[in-house]
A protein has these predicted regions:
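Short S/T/G/P-rich N-terminal loop/turn motif that feeds into the first structured element of a domain
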Residues: 1-56, 65-73, 89-105
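C-terminal structural segments of small proteins and small subunits
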Residues: 80-87
Length: 105
């Protein structure tokens, strides 16, 4: 993902996923692409931005907290979360924020 997500006027929500990866891929890239595709089909999904240079940061944008809750409990996403804990990440943190203002150029 190399583009900046097009989001509506605030308010909306951001889920910020920060991670450190373990060595090796072991299916990570395929699962990551699958999760972006699947998330984009979820009600309330607005967009996603991602970058990795040592530490990885993925920010997904959502219309409301209920949509985030539904995404977190999606069966395929639950499997990806489990695999992430078992083999892909040495550590991670998820934060959820309400976006009150945004600016762009």
């Amino acid at each position: 993902m190399s583009s900046i997500a097009k989001t509506p006027h605030p308010p909306y929500y951001a889920v910020i996923f920060t991670s450190h990866r373990n060595e090796g891929d072991s299916g990570y890239c395929e699962m990551s692409e699958r999760m972006v595709t699947l998330a984009a089909r979820q009600p309330g999904f607005l967009g996603v931005e991602s970058a990795r240079e040592g530490v990885g940061i993925t920010v997904s944008y959502w219309t409301d907290l209920e949509s985030i809750k539904n995404w977190k409990s999606n069966i395929e996403h639950l499997e990806a979360q489990s695999l992430g804990r078992k083999k892909w990440y040495s550590s991670y943190k998820t934060r959820i924020s309400k976006v009150e203002r945004d600016y762009e150029f």
